[in-house]
Regions:
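Solvent-exposed, non-transmembrane regions of membrane-associated and secreted proteins
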Residues: 2, 12-225
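C-terminal edge-of-domain segments
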Residues: 5
Length: 225
């Protein structure tokens, strides 16, 4: 009887050890996958920063309605082959927002890479910063993907600054206000049409039916050569 109990206890101990080993393996696998994802996201952010830096080293109220289609659901699962590609984009300018650690190039409106699922997207109807009383409109995702360049845009408040580098000129903008807009494929822009402005648009992280619109006004411009 004693031997039977001893064998039974040994079998129980063996099963417990096996369960612990399996649990440890699952935990370690999950941890490595999580660390790998963080590392990849860091690589993407560093790559974009370097590309933007290379570009820099090279040398009355108006109401506008524009089409903006930012669907966060589309970027939850990105194809693996998409992540491995590192296209050599021909940036025409750079957007920098120090408070939320963004320094990212943007493309010509007609460029195939000018797509919210690949880059910052310059919206049709935008003016470049050198156009008098113009309005540069840029949109980006706010989710948790590696292309969610505006994931921290909600942290901006009035008087925070953003810089746009274009045609060897550094344009300094300050946040003048923000508002929510319905997420229906269009955004109505309220701005002072007697000023040069920068409009930043992204999806709300708390309300899937809304988009956040930031209006920034030009404060100064200077050569950065």
């Amino acid at each position: 009887m004693f031997l039977k109990r001893t064998r039974k206890n040994k079998n129980i101990d063996k099963k417990e050890q096996q369960i612990k080993l399996v649990a440890s393996f699952i935990f370690l696998t999950g941890a490595f996958m999580y660390i790998g994802r963080i590392g990849y996201n860091y690589y993407i952010e560093l790559r974009d920063y370097k590309k933007a830096q290379e570009f820099l080293n090279i040398g009355k109220e108006e109401v506008e309605e524009i089409k903006v289609d930012i669907d966060e659901e589309e970027i939850k699962e990105q194809p693996k082959q998409e992540e491995k590609k590192t296209p050599n984009y021909n940036y025409i300018g750079v957007l920098e927002i120090p408070k939320i650690n963004i320094k990212k190039g943007f493309l010509n409106i007609k460029d195939k890479g000018n797509n919210v699922n690949k880059n910052l997207q310059v919206i049709k109807g935008s003016d470049m910063p050198n156009v008098k009383n113009g309005n540069l409109i840029i949109a980006a995702h706010s989710g948790n993907s590696y292309i969610s360049y505006f994931k921290n845009l909600h942290k901006l408040s009035n008087d925070d600054v953003a810089y746009v580098y274009f045609n060897n000129i550094k344009y300094t903008y300050k946040v003048a206000g923000k508002y929510d807009a319905e997420k229906n494929g269009k955004v109505t822009i309220h701005r002072d049409n007697k000023k040069n402005t920068l409009t930043l648009i992204t999806c709300s992280q708390t309300d899937k039916t809304k988009q956040i619109v930031y209006i920034l006004e030009l404060e100064s411009e200077e050569s950065y050569e």
